[in-house]
Amino acid sequence: MEPSDSASTAMEEPDSLEVLVKTLDSQTRTFIVGAQMNVKEFKEHIAASVSIPSEKQRLIYQGRVLQDDKKLQEYNVGGKVIHLVERAPPQTQLPSGASSGTGSASATHGGAPLPGTRGPGASVHDRNANSYVMVGTFNLPSDGSAVDVHINMEQAPIQSEPRVRLVMAQHMIRDIQTLLSRMECRGGTQAQASQPPPQTPQTVASETVALNSQTSEPVESEAPPREPMESEEMEERPPTQTPELAPSGPAPAGPAPAGPAPAPETNAPNHPSPAEHVEVLQELQRLQRRLQPFLQRYCEVLGAAATTDYNNNHEGREEDQRLINLVGESLRLLGNTFVALSDLRCNLACAPPRHLHVVRPMSHYTTPMVLQQAAIPIQINVGTTVTMTGNGARPPPAPGAEAATPGSAQATSLPPSSTTVDSSTEGAPPPGPAPPPASSHPRVIRISHQSVEPVVMMHMNIQDSGAQPGGVPSAPTGPLGPPGHGQTLGQQVPGFPTAPTRVVIARPTPPQARPSHPGGPPVSGALQGAGLGTNTSLAQMVSGLVGQLLMQPVLVAQGTPGMAQAQAQAQAQAQAQAQAPAPAPAPAPAPATASASAGTTNTATTAGPAPGGPAQPPPPQPSAADLQFSQLLGNLLGPAGPGAGGPGMASPTITVAMPGVPAFLQGMTDFLQASQTAPPPPPPPPPPPPAPEQQSTPPPGSPSGGTASPGGLGPESLPPEFFTSVVQGVLSSLLGSLGARAGSSESIAAFIQRLSGSSNIFEPGADGALGFFGALLSLLCQNFSMVDVVMLLHGHFQPLQRLQPQLRSFFHQHYLGGQEPTPSNIRMATHTLITGLEEYVRESFSLVQVQPGVDIIRTNLEFLQEQFNSIAAHVLHCTDSGFGARLLELCNQGLFECLALNLHCLGGQQMELAAVINGRIRRMSRGVNPSLVSWLTTMMGLRLQVVLEHMPVGPDAILRYVRRVGDPPQTLPEEPMEVQGAERTSPEPQRENASPAPGTTAEEAMSRGPPPAPEGGSRDEQDGASADAEPWAAAVPPEWVPIIQQDIQSQRKVKPQPPLSDAYLSGMPAKRRKTMQGEGPQLLLSEAVSRAAKAAGARPLTSPESLSRDLEAPEVQESYRQQLRSDIQKRLQEDPNYSPQRFPNAHRAFADDP
């Protein structure tokens, strides 16, 4: 019995029940079933409609799970809503990978609605099609119609990239065998192809490919590119066909899991043996022999194709066209298989048993290996569920027509609260008009972020980025989704090889489409003038953006093709700053092209040119070494991938990588770098924070950049206005629950203050914003909005250029104290500032083992002085448009050199360096939720490992900074010390006039005393405080000056108490006051004796009343007071911390009576 729409009403018969079933995608379906049907039969009845097998269904009604053996009537569910969820997978076995429903993709590919959907044209997406996925595994269908990724946040086992290469090769061998079988048995194929799409059961056979922390390449060729005149559905393969694999081919079609995938239980990588490689190569040879006769016929057809007349030979034309398509697809798969296997090597110098290893990751190659994959970083917060569903652009079979129109975008139904991106490109025009149901539907990739808020989902449609001449555009087919759902809009532009890209954001409340670009009409307009690279750039930009917003940004790897190493930037501290007032310099920018989850998945989105060959043509190399270093430090998203315009534009790709994959980042070096001739534009320019932060948290100057001149972005880049509108749309959607206004330019400081309810988080002198670096953080947070930061992350440095005057003024006032920015003054201020960090450096390295003979304190201080001197000189002197680019380069270079320097000083022990970093994080995060601190330290350890493995700074570059014990002091600080002494002569005479004590006592106490909190690192600010406080400083003894200054700064750190509270009235927190009660000596002897007797459990010999009267006698009480005073006097005399000058009235209370 077919289900009807939830809005429909059906006449209920006495022996029937109307049951409403609501699934997790918020769709409600109505079923009319017999009253005597039991729950198991009901599950089987609805399985086809909900695309969930009956054995995996769990029906819940009023908090109870319906039992299979009971009847529906017993639960009284008539007319009620039952919730349907999927049963959790078994945790003790490998996934079977063969449980997809029959309707998961048929609506998408056929264009006709299935019964039970909520509107015509809506597609039925099985959220968990192709079964579940265990830790670190992907279930991939045999035809590429859907890919669902469920990522378990637990630690994934270590597996082998060579093993994945073999699995990929075996999958492609299986596909080649299927194509050969179709060519050899044409009859069955024709019968299959003659069925119309809506009636074709979409039975998806899954394969399980184990991808783990060593995997760097995506499983490709599950959705191969389409020929514009392909008459048949290439990937539609019956699951009953058994591939003719060799005995080593452990990837049979159907539910059997892929054999070579190692079990997730193992902790060591299961590398394949060379014998397995040989077996796969032998199978390839057999396939080549089978393909040879068809290849000869293929050559004959192509040789005569230019002049052959098919006017009266429709059957011959279809046969030849079919042969061309199938042989061409076979050649593509065969070539990809050889490419996948060509990087497998065996090192004969190793001791047996030897295994295979990979010399070049798949990301090294451009589009032939990773074509038609959307650039989606999978970002996961702890506890989130991420589902990536990729629906390949698959032309459905048609009875006699060879028409597939890749230009039309299929309207797709999305769940509520979805962030939708439709990026569809046009292909070649079809030979004739084709009906909308025969259109080629775009690849759909969804990423759900489930948290307390409703699901935030990113939905991106990307079709073939084939650079073909613009064809006749076709309108979207069918209505744009049912009410209440996000709409997927795909507009085509005649004459453009790439269609414009649309970003539509919808919230759970009344959804409204939000066009992402300001230049065109609101919804139906077309983006003009964004350049040929818009599709790729926007796909990558939105991918990285949504990923960063859903989680912590972590790493980037880029470089020129000639470089051997790639840059990897560690995690930024922006999120920690937003959640706790930490004294970091700025909400550090994070990369857009690579991001990682909580120790599970590291996803990099890349784009490169799409030439016909398998290798990327080398772009022009910069001539200068500093230019190469600039490029190495970062190229994120400025312009699109290819350096030259024209049809050969980049294709969005997806590369699935895991933390700690050396080959991945090395391949990214070659793969990411397109034509660049100028230093990259930067993100925010925070100077280095205090030393421990410089070594620990890499916030100061995260990777970023683009391929643009310092004056602006290149002609192929996205306009800043367009970029801003996209960012505002996504931010408004994701931050709407926090009260953010749409299109708001609210600063980060105002945003955090509004959320925290406190008005002094970023005010000068408030908690977490003291000292030079705290004031710098306050400046950046007050001037940067969320949109500005995200734009900076993606290489649009306009916000940074806008902040240049404020930064220069800030450095002039807070750094130089109003003096002229001469080299001597800058050196003096740098020395004063960095010297104040000595206690922090000493504290940070107090618990780790430093390399023998190395003076770690001097090494860090002198290194930071040199680096910060360059940064400050640049900020104070640079006035041209290259301000931001050079500043970013200085910050990045200083950061990497700092990490490399300290790693060298710690004897190359990464664990020691991680201990320094995590210790600093814990000290900075006092009072923060311990689980958050633990997560931060864990994430930092993972990121640090990746960064250190691919450090772009070699040991030779930092040896000049190493200081040994006994080395002569550096001569540079002498001048600052002299100037510093001259500067301080002004307040000293006043103090000498006010007190006979030496005038240097206060300065000595200040230099020897512990610096107050992170803010105390700024000694020039302390000097300023002394100068500003001259009136009271002259009126008190000089030794009181540092004590009063410390008290002032300590009082500023204390958060204000609510007015007129108990704590306010009593002068101390209520909890502390309660714990203090009863402590200290009792002034009444009777009370003291009573408490002592009670504590000891003693009982008086006489009555308590008689004892009390005796103790209250005046002479006894006076003797007690004298004894108490004597004890206190003795305690004060023996206390080294007691000073009569600090407590001038103490003698009145405790001295003998006059």
Curated annotation (Swiss-Prot):
Organism the protein comes from: Mus musculus
UniProt xrefs under Gene3D superfamilies: Phosphatidylinositol 3-kinase Catalytic Subunit, Chain A, domain 1 (3.10.20.90)
Keywords per UniProt: Acetylation, Apoptosis, Chaperone, Chromatin regulator, Cytoplasm, Differentiation, Immunity, Nucleus, Phosphoprotein, Repeat, Secreted, Spermatogenesis, Transport
Segments of skewed composition (Low complexity): 96-112, 400-409, 568-581, 591-609, 1029-1042, 1088-1098
Biased composition (Pro residues): 249-263, 428-439, 508-521, 611-622, 678-702
A Pfam cross-reference name: Bag6_BAGS
MF annotations from Gene Ontology: Hsp70 protein binding; misfolded protein binding; polyubiquitin modification-dependent protein binding; proteasome binding; protein carrier chaperone; receptor ligand activity; ribosome binding; ubiquitin protein ligase binding
S-S bonds: none
Disruption phenotype: Lethality associated with pronounced developmental defects in the lung, kidney and brain. Lethality is either embryonic consecutive to abnormal brain development or perinatal associated with pronounced developmental defects in the lung and kidney. These developmental defects were associated with widespread aberrant apoptosis and proliferation. Lethality can be partially rescued in an ICR genetic background: mice are slightly smaller in size than their wild-type counterparts and show impaired genotoxic stress responses.
SMART domains reported in the protein's UniProt record: UBQ
Alphabetized SUPFAM superfamilies for the sequence: Formin homology 2 domain (FH2 domain), Ubiquitin-like
Modification type N-acetylmethionine: residues: 1
Protein name as catalogued: Large proline-rich protein BAG6
CC annotations in GO: BAT3 complex; cytoplasm; cytosol; extracellular exosome; membrane; nucleoplasm; nucleus
Sequence repeat placement: 237-271, 416-444, 597-624, 630-658
Main location: cytoplasm
CDD domains xrefs: Ubl_BAG6
Annotated spans, Disordered: 87-125, 186-274, 387-442, 463-531, 568-626, 673-719, 968-1154
Taxonomic path: Eukaryota, Metazoa, Chordata, Craniata, Vertebrata
Motif Nuclear localization site, chain ranges: 1034-1076
